Amino acid sequence: MLPITDRLLHLLGLEKTAFRIYAVSTLLLFLLFFLFRLLLRFLRLCRSFYITCRRLRCFPQPPRRNWLLGHLGMYLPNEAGLQDEKKVLDNMHHVLLVWMGPVLPLLVLVHPDYIKPLLGASAAIAPKDDLFYGFLKPWLGDGLLLSKGDKWSRHRRLLTPAFHFDILKPYMKIFNQSADIMHAKWRHLAEGSAVSLDMFEHISLMTLDSLQKCVFSYNSNCQEKMSDYISAIIELSALSVRRQYRLHHYLDFIYYRSADGRRFRQACDMVHHFTTEVIQERRRALRQQGAEAWLKAKQGKTLDFIDVLLLARDEDGKELSDEDIRAEADTFMFEGHDTTSSGISWMLFNLAKYPEYQEKCREEIQEVMKGRELEELEWDDLTQLPFTTMCIKESLRQYPPVTLVSRQCTEDIKLPDGRIIPKGIICLVSIYGTHHNPTVWPDSKVYNPYRFDPDNPQQRSPLAYVPFSAGPRNCIGQSFAMAELRVVVALTLLRFRLSVDRTRKVRRKPELILRTENGLWLKVEPLPPRA
């Protein structure tokens, strides 16, 4: 009998019997074994952490706040934080180490040669990490943004045809119509003179309007009256951002008992219900009519995103499930509206700030539209806007909608200088940092569209400019986004003169996308109708 057994029985007030002595002794042995295993595991973790720390010593790091907080709270998601980050990048041009508290190291990569091994790696070697993207999982499921391994590869293969030029061309009419609705609102608000408007507010609704038509063939009139579905998407984006900055909400069992967590769940249910209803109704029609008759009935109409996914098949004829299609549709709605609205808003801001470039873009667009009765851009017109495209690219360099992407290494990754990123480390590929790296982009603060002049190509790495990421996990919808960007910018310049509202200071705010702290206000002045 263990000496402690007799004492334990006495403390519990239990009579000594052979069975009780045996049972308590066995229980204590199991408890000791469990504690030993726990201690062993803890020691292994400590040893692994120590080895990782030693391997990370070769990477430079900015001064920490202290040993406990590390760099936590030093680079806040606001204008001051971006300026502090720029000061660091002026001295550390390739890769740097930051500590989120005492035990979570992150490597930040800010140079084309150093982001190449990460962005070029397969989804199995450098998948999206769960720490930064996990909050979106209940909303977006296993769509392209969050899925991994074979599932990601299969979905990427099946979704690629949805972004073929032949599918995108009919969307041009939708882009034109959505821009027309927004511009009609602007004219009404301006009443013939200049009016100050928040670009993010108006353009975000416009991109959501376009996306609902492109994804679901559904006209919600959300630019005129907010729908429950659109309200839910906007709320989900805001709640996801808020959760990132509340450490106690990182734990699901706490978050979903909070007011924010309950609202997040309700908004998810709303979005999922809408998407699922559309998919099921469309699938029933497809099965009843058959693919050939169903496609024939679609002639003359735009084939939307849901249609393409319902028709998608593997080599063996296997189709995507309703859940798979829902995840991809929700992902496209999330990724497509915020990023594009950010890109358009910052582009219009730059043209308002530099009227000489605005006027040159306007002249280019007027030349393309000369002799037309309708102010409507067609697919082939997009290639006739070289200077406008240069301005868009420079704006995406200076103000990338997505400022960083994160990856978690599942194996050691070697950098160009021979240093090794240890397995298990989370790496932040800083798109903003790369686009503002002074060794890659001289005078990076200056807005200069001629950096992208095709007649004067610069000797730069293809990875110096990555607003849509790069490699196997690059943005599948970048052609869609660039088409919408050019249409909306072109029609806006054709109809309005833009200027900066000097009474409202622009202060950047990197969240899920690059926003501003108090809106992006521009003065919008209607131009007289074309002769």
Swiss-Prot record:
Residues 44-531 are cytoplasmic. The gene is CYP4F22. Its cofactor is heme. It is found in: Endoplasmic reticulum membrane; Microsome membrane. It is an enzyme of class 1 (oxidoreductase). It comes from Homo sapiens. This is Ultra-long-chain fatty acid omega-hydroxylase. The lineage of its organism: Eukaryota, Metazoa, Chordata, Craniata, Vertebrata. Changing residue 435 to Y: In ARCI5; results in impaired synthesis of omega-hydroxyceramides. Changing residue 436 to D: In ARCI5; results in impaired synthesis of omega-hydroxyceramides. One of its GO terms (cellular component) is endoplasmic reticulum membrane. It is a single-pass type I membrane protein. Keywords: Endoplasmic reticulum, Heme, Ichthyosis, Iron, Lipid metabolism, Membrane, Metal-binding, Microsome, Monooxygenase, Oxidoreductase, Transmembrane, Transmembrane helix. Its EC number is 1.14.14.177.
